[in-house]
Amino acid sequence: MRRNLLLLLCLAGLLAVDAQTLSRSEVETYVINQYGKRWKDIALYFGEKDTLDKDNALTFEKTISVRGKSKNELFVDLNYWFLKTFSNASSSIEMADKELGVIMAKGYLPGIAYHSGGYSSYCVNIRPLVRCDIKDEQVKLTIVVPNYEVTKVDDGIWSAMLDEDFDKHPPYTVNETWSLNDCFPFAKKDGTKKTSSKALVMSHGYVEVLMNRIQMAL
């Protein structure tokens, strides 16, 4: 039962974003089709191209040209799409200003990476920040992955061996924030390389899929 606790916590997060049109399974399918499943190698590939900003966050930008559509038309289309997609307690629209031509939203994708072993198990979630700057015939997308939100459960094999009452009390669970500069491949000395590798690859996948979806909405 203890071994299933983290899986249940991850599942609860997945159910919480069921209303979103962008799910973890869709992102993972996209990532596997595009890059494969060698998480560490793919993370190293991205690490060679990625540069963390002054806040140790990853920032992605893309400019989409939409011929023949005015600023107001693009705003209406995007605002409608965001209302459908970011519509629950975990993901939401933070700002929608038609006059300024700005839409800002906060996304959420739980369970992008999971690892169990050693002393603890980990379930990694991301909460990307999305901004659209809208002009006539053009939308500039900016997506920021600020960190990894991690649920850590001390239920690993070593915890079981060292705790005589392992099965008699609930495991210790804590929510952590992992700074990207402390995670592989940005940090070479990372005790959770496998988890960090998949988290980075899935973050890239989320951004790519989200950008594609936004472009299709225009």
Placement of each model-derived feature along the sequence:
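Bacterial Sec-dependent N-terminal signal peptides
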Residues: 1-24
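Ser/Thr-rich, low-complexity intrinsically disordered terminal regions
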Residues: 20-218
